[in-house]
């Protein structure tokens, strides 16, 4: 393929002037660009159905960018086959022309479409090959004027030749259509096979997932069952270990008894049994007296309790009173019979705490002595009464008024506290005259002025300052 050396605008003008097919090829440095360059080298422009004007552009150049503004070129390399009206008849890219056969089929289809779209006379003229075609040479500089190409003259062929060419072109077109139809059918079949394969794969994947889920559920159920069995076995083992430890402990301390009998005995037994005394040589006692003081004494175990009683009687707070000795726990009150028993017999060994409690007989004896002293004083007063009478008569005869003095002193004593009490209990109120006297009867108070004898001044008022008769 021989390429035009000018720019795109000049190539368009020449193609329209010569009624030729315009080919714009945009190449790249990639592998696809090199393949397309090889395809164009196999095409002989002198052996085509119509005249062509081809221009080769480099991707990234200014001319290629200007052409891309009119005809977008998203995929490169690309070849645009454009008719006289500027309409692309075919766009050949690596997507549709990966092999030379595909590339040539697209190219032949575009040339045939270009020839069929032209008038018959022009088509016959263009379809007749020239004996010595000469490519149009244009200088590389775009500033120089481009001379018009020399028109190619071809001898007029016979009608049989034109019919053969038309028939050959129709056969090529039919063959190209058949190939395209076969290709479409093959592509559709491949697509159906691919869709079928995808559906089969999806079905297999779904079935495999369901199987995996079912296996996971079965495995989880088995795992839970095993865990449950393990937990039950551990529980039984722990209970058995606890039971064995309990039996061992009971055997060790001699307390292996029946559980049911022990519970029944525990419910029935409400009183605490008193343990037996521990035999010992000495008995240590802590005694608490009624005043709160305590003391500690130690006796031989074979000594009697009366020894402790004698020591308690010598205490100052107990001297001259009656008392009794009690044991707080277990609760016990010692009697006179217990005083003659030993500490061991009274179960007080080796040590015990005792409490001394005073009896109420001491208060009755004091009351009796108090009544006795009162009777004695009354008797003495009755005996001395005549002497007192004679003394008062003698003092009256002499002029000594002992009774009056006593009465005056008594009255002074009585007046003093009462006056002070009244003055203290009734302080003087602000705004009231000293001569005013208040008469109060319950919740009713009356004001009286001793200096004036006015009935209105003796008016009575209740607690709400309301006057009433």
UniProtKB/Swiss-Prot annotation:
Cytoplasmic face of the membrane: 1-378, 400-469
Result of knocking out the encoding gene: RNAi-mediated knockdown causes a reduction in lifespan. Induces ER stress characterized by the expression of hsp-4, the accumulation of ubiquitinated proteins and an increase in ubql-1 expression.
UniProt KW keywords: Coiled coil, Endoplasmic reticulum, Membrane, Unfolded protein response
Swiss-Prot/TrEMBL induction comment: Induced upon ER stress. Down-regulated upon heat stress.
Segments for region (Disordered): 181-212, 404-469
Membrane topology: Peripheral membrane protein
Disulphide connectivity of cysteines: none
Highest taxon, organism lineage: Eukaryota
Comp. bias regions, Low complexity: 416-430
Entries under InterPro entries matching the protein: Ubiquitin-like_domsf, UBX_dom
Intramembrane segments: 379-399
SMART domains recorded: UBX
Coiled-coil ranges per UniProt: 162-214
GO cellular component terms, A-Z: endoplasmic reticulum; endoplasmic reticulum membrane
UBX domain span: 278-356
Expression by tissue: Expressed in the germline.
A Pfam family reported for this protein in Swiss-Prot or TrEMBL: UBX
UniProt record, GO biological process: ERAD pathway; response to unfolded protein
Compartments (UniProt record): Endoplasmic reticulum membrane
Domain comment as written in the entry: The intramembrane domain also contains the signal for ER targeting.
PANTHER family, per database record: UBX DOMAIN-CONTAINING PROTEIN 4 (PTHR46424:SF1)
The protein's assembly and partners: Interacts with cdc-48.1 (via N-terminus) and cdc-48.2 (via N-terminus).
Biological role: Probably acts as an adapter for ATPase cdc-48.1 and/or cdc-48.2, conferring substrate specificity. May play a role in the ER-associated protein degradation pathway (ERAD) possibly acting as a platform to recruit both ubql-1 and cdc-48.1 and/or cdc-48.2 to the ER during ERAD.
Name of the molecule in the record: UBX domain-containing protein 4
Source organism of the structure: Caenorhabditis elegans
Origin organism lineage: Eukaryota, Metazoa, Ecdysozoa, Nematoda, Chromadorea
